[in-house]
Amino acid sequence: MEKLLIKGGKSLRGTIKCAGAKNAALPMIAATILSSENVILKNLPYLQDITTMFELLGSMGAKIVLNENMDFDISSNNLDDTEARYELVKTMRASILVLGPLVARYGRARIALPGGCAIGSRPVNFHLDALEQLGAKIILRNGYIEATANELVGTKIKFDGITVTGTENIMMAACLAKGTTYLTNVAKEPEIEDLANLLNAMWADVQGAGTDEIVINGVSNLHGTSFSIPADRIEAGTYLVAAAVTRGNVNVDGINPERLSKVIQKLEESGADISMTNNSIALSMENSELKPVDITTAPFPEFPTDMQAQFSVMNAIAKGTSNIYETVFENRFMHIQELNRMGCDIEINGNQAVIKGVKSLYGAEVMATDLRASASLILAGLCAEGQTTVSRIYHIDRGYERIEEKLNYLGAEILRLPS
């Protein structure tokens, strides 16, 4: 198991380009199941979760080729299996995204429940309830979701709670349903719009993605296309915060600022000097003092839960007290205990973190607990005095492409070491 060794105290400077968005790429890979023709996906990030999704499709009989342009040519026609086995699903909850496409295209699917997933408390039930409303029959048996359908039929569906993957799953399934499907109480994340754009490029008829209602007019089949994955807004936000906590000056290229409007707003409140084009965001904290900012996470277009941990670090070294309220996920403060080992002064009260700024953080041996928590520990190591070791970094490799290489390019000093 590898770890990262970080020597703190280096200001980050320079320009960096975002990788393709993991949260856009995963449903797009699943969407290739809907087509009888090849789909070419460009700008896919090189991440463990992408590899896992390819392994999942490959286990069903899909053919995936890296072509001469370094794009992935995917053929999911005539799959010989429609089962997503636990060995793969347990490592990535997004595996559930193949459920809707498999039932819509092949009339059947057997998907292992994601590891540690309690149906009552996680939004997987939103997927299942909505798929049943489209006409599927679903049985939960021996840790698997077994779904069948002779035909899916469009209907009006209101999700019981906002769910990104649930919205994506049903949006994909409805593309091959008979008639029109109306989805309300839907997620509005940019990645929903990205998926709709891909589906429409495959000759689907999806309208209203990113608004309060998504309308899908079913078609008989979808075609092949070539599509480029947009930049990862969470990766962009993470590097902007890295610049802020190291008192640096970094330009993130290839990202639409509108996708990070709330993050940018909070960075400006913190004292950062921000400049933007329609395709880049630059942040300078060289001549500013960090100010604490209060944050409440919520579904898009509000402040993203995936940036909460990074802002915890920024607030931890700001002068004053701040509050972070996590309203999207339970147990999203697991990084706080590790940050406190580095000198942070953070107290957790339920879904609230009260952060009292300190003068300095100090290097320590810390352990990542999840993807965004691992990012926060790396940021803390960058601005800490001395040396920090972050273990269990397989979490970071699930969502950040070559993070230590990119940060080193900006002036950090990070080594990847075997345990």
Identify the residue ranges that each predicted region occupies.
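Short, structured segments at the rim of ligand-binding sites
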Residues: 1-419
